[in-house]
A protein has these predicted regions:
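Alpha-helical coupling/stalk and coiled-coil linker elements that connect catalytic or binding modules
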Residues: 1-363, 370-376, 382-399, 423
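ATPase nucleotide-binding head domains, primarily ABC-like/P-loop NTPase cores
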Residues: 188, 307, 314-557
Length: 557
């Protein structure tokens, strides 16, 4: 009796201390990034698996994600409070948008922004789930059998152990049978638990995830109701899995060394962890889809909360206007567009229309590539999070395709030009599909000679913008140093440049978009500022002037 009482006290103390630590955990303040340093390959694991399973349709491919440096954008937008939310933020940015889900999520974000009490309640509920094991919850949803087939022997061995101990006072020979049985049980436990070592953390997060869901269902706000109703129904179905997960993860006993020690002695006889794994395996077989649906919903609530938090710190933002009138051309228009990672950047007004592309010229370091990335990032943010870093935005395209960062593919033995040509051919096929898209190119075909570079760039641009057949609905922007293209494409492209001034040899980059081609050159000035020999700079300047004069005489640029 005394031992039973002492064991109960120890268990109660362990549960209380664990609960106290949870309550003391302070969540991140509203309006601040999560500052989470989890490797991106871990964060993206769930999305990559769902993509491989055909559960999501990808809108932003790997090339575009890298070109737009979206890992950094994701970190800047990551005001999520849970691992599941962080994973869902990544999926929301990369997957083809669901307009109904986007509208519902944006409505919740606006409600959170408008009501401080709702913001605090949602944050408090989400803060239950924060463990690193949450990043691997998706692995539980894909697991077919935990611990292997030998685990099915665990219940029979437990019953045999209990029976042998019960008859041992009357039949001492039972101890001789129990000892080898316990040794076999120890091996079975070690084998079974060793196969699921990486899943103990995810199991430990099932209970916090369900607690977060339950607290969200208790919040009475109309904007949260669509989520709360589904979370409540799914949570009720997962109660048995929650109990099993606590057993598997030893949620209570691991919080206290003494309680844990007592548990290990009992576990040696009753094989508690092996039986828990068996029950968990069967529960997951029945409820994996339910668990995934609940995690997706919880993640979307966290994304909505994060979007509200991000909006509160952006210097300017807007919800984009979508769609065109019948017969109107596809259009992308931003007023004062910026970048979420550049709060003090120079805003610009940009308009692109199908059938009329944009040639962006300018000196080195003037911001051409950055402006292309700004356009691409804002289309992604507008289509996925219903948020653009601009004063106003009109979007009739929701797909971005890029060819910005140029590198050799050394592993595949592909030159710069070959690797780039593969991308361009793929983009041409996408353009021919007549799906409204924004194509962004930076220094097209830089890996080949000037004559073929200019000729190929002209042909590709004409095809994408629709000048060749009049049927393409794509929006196209090309950053280039080849001013010859401004003359060759004058009938279907408008030319712009980013403002640069030079005073007493000092280059001042204004980053403001201006109509017309760039006339200022900064490459030689930069060489001089970096300390290149004066005779080298002078010789280069003389040759550049000679080449310009020759181009003028032959009608070039």
């Amino acid at each position: 009796m005394f031992l039973a009482f002492a064991g109960g006290v120890l268990l109660a103390f362990g549960a209380w201390s664990w609960s106290l630590r949870r309550r003391r955990r302070a969540g991140q303040p509203f309006g601040t990034a999560a500052n989470d340093d989890t490797p991106m390959e871990v964060v993206s694991g769930w999305y990559r698996q769902r993509r491989a399973d055909g559960q999501v349709v990808e809108a932003v491919d790997d090339r575009t994600w890298r070109d737009l440096e979206m890992d950094g954008v994701l970190r800047a937008l990551d005001h999520c409070r849970t691992p599941i939310g962080r994973q869902q933020l990544l999926e929301t940015l990369r997957a083809t948008p669901d307009s109904t889900q986007r509208s519902r999520r944006s409505h919740l974000s606006e409600a959170i922004s408008a009501h401080g009490a709702l913001q605090a309640e949602v944050a408090r509920a989400l803060d239950h789930h924060h463990g690193y094991g949450g990043y691997a919850l998706w692995r539980l949803m894909r697991t077919t059998e935990l611990g292997g087939p030998w685990l099915r022997l665990a219940p029979f061995m437990t019953m045999a152990s209990v029976l042998l101990l019960a008859v041992a006072p009357f039949k001492p020979l039972a101890i001789a049978v129990f000892i080898p049985l316990a040794a076999i049980g120890l091996w079975l436990r070690t084998y079974a638990t060793g196969t699921v070592t990486g899943l103990i953390g995810p199991f430990r997060e099932i209970s916090p995830v369900l607690r977060a869901a339950r607290e969200l269902t208790a919040i009475t706000d109309p904007a949260l109701t669509p989520y709360a109703e589904q979370l409540r129904a799914l949570g009720d179905q997962l109660r048995s899995l929650e109990r099993v997960s606590r057993w598997v993860s030893r949620e209570v006993v691991t919080s206290n060394e003494l309680v844990g020690g007592v548990y290990e002695y009992v576990n040696l006889v009753l094989m508690l962890d092996a039986n828990a794994l068996l029950l968990a395996s069967r529960a997951l077989q029945r409820q994996r889809e339910t668990l995934e649906q609940l995690c997706l919903l919880l993640g979307q609530v966290d994304v909505a909360h994060a979007v509200s938090s991000v909006r509160s710190v952006l210097p300017v933002w807007c919800r984009p206007t979508r769609g065109t009138q019948s017969g109107e051309a596809e259009t992308l228009a931003f007023e004062g567009v910026g970048h979420p990672q550049l709060p003090h950047g120079v805003p610009n007004d940009v308009t692109l229309t199908a059938g009329r592309g944009m040639l962006l010229t300018g000196a080195n370091m003037s911001g051409k590539s950055t402006l292309l990335r700004i356009l691409g990032v804002n289309v992604i943010l507008g289509s996925s999070l219903d948020t653009c870093v601009a004063r106003a935005a009109l979007m009739t395209v929701e797909r971005v395709v890029t060819c910005i960062a140029h590198v050799d593919d050394f592993a595949a033995s592909k030159s710069l030009f070959f690797a780039e040509a593969e991308v361009v051919v793929r983009h041409l096929r996408l353009g021919d599909a007549h799906v409204p898209s924004l194509f962004l190119f930076d220094e097209l075909f830089r890996g080949t000679n000037a004559a073929e570079r200019i000729a190929a760039a002209e042909a590709v641009m004409r095809r994408l913008v629709g000048a060749a057949d009049g049927g393409n609905r794509s929006l196209v922007a090309l950053a280039t140093h080849d001013l010859e293209l401004t003359r060759l494409l004058a009938d279907c492209f408008d030319t712009w440049h980013l403002e640069v001034t030079m005073t007493d040899g000092h280059t001042d980059f204004r980053y403001r978009l201006q109509a017309g081609p760039a006339r200022m050159r900064t490459a030689l000035a930069l060489l001089e500022q970096l300390g290149a020999p004066a005779d080298v700079v002078m010789s280069a300047a003389t040759r550049a002037a000679s080449l310009d004069a020759r181009a003028e005489r032959t009608g070039g640029s």
